[in-house]
Amino acid sequence: MKSVSSLIKINRIESPQFLNSEKDNVTFFSPSKKKYFQTSFYKNQRRKTGILMVGENPIGKWTYDDENRKKYPKNKLPPQIIYPKENSNYSSEAYSYVNTHFKNNYGHLNTDTNYPSDFVSAKNWLNNFLEERFVEFGDYEDAIVKGEAILNHSLLSPLINSGLLTPNYVVNELNEYATKKSIPINSYEGIIRQIIGWREFIRGIYQNYSEKMIGSNYW
């Protein structure tokens, strides 16, 4: 790609869908290393961003993963979820396409609108998470309950992965809200770890070893 772009004058820019550039990842994911540890990567990310840091030292602990595993109380009422309104411009076209081209497939088309389809609805979804689910996100980060689809989970991954929200935007909103509302540190650190830690770490692995991963059954 780089050699071709130099011939036809294409400017190659970094994707805003990730916090790290490909160049940022080169040093950590050096081929000379035998193993890569997410914890080491995450600590580097915290130092680089300054999130939950005082100088080179973390505020509290590096990770509150051991405080992200509470069982959801039996009689606890889950937070209110505000689902996005249907965007008829996109939805009707999508329904028509699926019914036309996949009408003989198994199952049926679910027309419920569960995910945002534009920036405004994605932003509203993020705001609803901040206001309703963020405060106890850390306690119930790993919780599941039969019959409940969301609980305190953010469901921000599809919005970031599809480009409706950038990780930089989400992290800035998280930082601002957590500071204003005194969000518990296990909730704050828990979701920051997912975005600047795990997501960027897996991308770095794929960036450097995609061919090996695709051609093997390592995972």
What are these regions (language model features)?
Residues 1-118:
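Beta-rich, aromatic/charged-enriched effector core domains that present basic-aromatic interfaces
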Residues 124-127, 131-219:
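Gly/Thr-rich phosphate-binding loop signature of adenosyl cofactor/nucleotide-binding cores
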